[in-house]
Amino acid sequence: MTQDVEMKDNNTPSQSIISSSTSTMQNLKEIAALIDTGSYTKEVRRIARAVRLTIGLRQKLTGSVLSSFLDFALVPGSEAHSRLSSFVPKGDEHDMEVDTASSATQAAPSKHLPAELEIYCYFIVLLFLIDQKKYNEAKACSSASIARLKNVNRRTIDVIASRLYFYYSLSYEQTGDLAEIRGTLLALHHSATLRHDELGQETLLNLLLRNYLHYNLYDQAEKLRSKAPRFEAHSNQQFCRYLFYLGKIRTIQLEYTDAKESLLQAARKAPIAALGFRIQCNKWAILVRLLLGEIPERSIFTQKGMEKALRPYFELTNAVRIGDLELFRTVQEKFLDTFAQDRTHNLIVRLRHNVIRTGLRNISISYSRISLPDVAKKLRLNSENPVADAESIVAKAIRDGAIDATIDHKNGCMVSKETGDIYSTNEPQTAFNSRIAFCLNMHNEAVRALRFPPNTHKEKESDEKRRERKQQEEELAKHMAEEDDDDF
């Protein structure tokens, strides 16, 4: 009895692996049937559902399952089957058991293979290779899939094609060869425009913007963005990426107000699961707000899952808020590698001027009269002639309206004027107006994002028309009954 129990325990892991793989294979067959039906009825929503279901199975894909699925979906010995099978690794003993178990229930492939199913096979193999971090094989597989896509012009493939474009760019980015495919992406975007493939245009435009920004080609990115056709967004994820890239371009072009709006909108619209993307949006939004002279709320830095990633930017914000130039230098040197990795170091260099302005504003509020050497000392200016630099900084701040003061050149001091009542100015009105405009824009976006049932725009049937219709139906039924009686 004991030996029997032990034998059952030993076989349990193997049986669980087989049952798990068999269920995954069964799910893939159902997805293939869904794609086949969508191809026949030309329903894009079925193809989109198949892609969503595949993402859910992503972690369960193995080499043996993929090999069995390729045998099921593609004609053995065909060009696509031979090419894709070369990318799938051969399994071990358990995998062979799974192959045998799945092949017992395997149906013979149809004689007519839909192009959607073939492209889907490319997609699922590419997804597996990227998850296994086999980027060189993924490059070859994605290049073959793009070559196959160029010969297919069907709108039911657009959903799968957009995913292939994304992973095509990702595989080249991971191997450091992103510049090689820029021409191909431009040609694909041109083809998608001619074919009215709006989802493909969205995806390819974002990939091209990412390609340009990866190599700091901001001018080329802006030229492409401004000339590319725009339309209503089809994918929320692609629209969020577009807003993020637009915010980065606007930031480099010193258009901080537009950049702030784009970055905050991207962070707000992004899915909750996209934590890394929301962190990147918040990093750039924090820097843009600092460059605008604003201090972000503390709650931004304490969002769930973001505390550690935003810690360097929290300390940077604290240095800017205090106006301590020495603390700003310390934070900049402490997190130099982090800022370089985030590619935000150039923006942080711009913040030095804001730190000085903030420190000078604090001095102006605290002192009605202070000598320029003391100003240089409090600002911690470590130049060869700090007094002359302090005088120049104060003069520029007065000219720009950052402080309300005058310079007494004879005595070498800064004289601050009395602080007026801010509520007697237009600043509160401007602040409230910006908040109201933000709420109205959010309401309008929420209304546009609503989904309404079909035929809601049609007028409802009136009572008179309803009575006429029912009367006609009754007369027709009575007439048909009389005809049946005549037959008897």
Curated annotation (Swiss-Prot):
Keyword Chaperone: no
Domain PCI positions: 240-421
A Pfam short name: Rpn3_C
Keywords carried by this UniProt record: Proteasome
Gene3D superfamilies, per database record: 1.25.40.570
GO molecular function list: enzyme regulator activity
InterPro entries: 26S_Psome_reg_C (IPR013586), CSN3 (IPR050756), PCI_dom (IPR000717), WH_DNA-bd_sf (IPR036390)
Compositional bias per record (Basic and acidic residues), positions renumbered to this chain: 456-481
Region listing for Disordered, in residue ranges: 451-488
PROSITE patterns: PCI
GO cellular component: cytosol; nucleus; plasmodesma; proteasome complex
A Gene Ontology BP annotation from the UniProt entry: regulation of protein catabolic process
Gene disruption phenotype: Short pollen tube growth and failure to exit the style.
Transmembrane segments: none
Distribution of this protein across tissues and organs: Ubiquitous with highest expression in flowers.
Top-level taxon: Eukaryota
Family: Belongs to the proteasome subunit S3 family.
Functional summary from the UniProt entry: Acts as a regulatory subunit of the 26 proteasome which is involved in the ATP-dependent degradation of ubiquitinated proteins.
Quaternary data: Component of the 19S regulatory particle (RP/PA700) lid subcomplex of the 26S proteasome. The 26S proteasome is composed of a core protease (CP), known as the 20S proteasome, capped at one or both ends by the 19S regulatory particle (RP/PA700). The RP/PA700 complex is composed of at least 17 different subunits in two subcomplexes, the base and the lid, which form the portions proximal and distal to the 20S proteolytic core, respectively. Interacts with UCH1 and UCH2.
Name of this chain's protein: 26S proteasome non-ATPase regulatory subunit 3 homolog A
Lineage of the organism: Eukaryota, Viridiplantae, Streptophyta, Embryophyta, Tracheophyta
Gene (name only): RPN3A
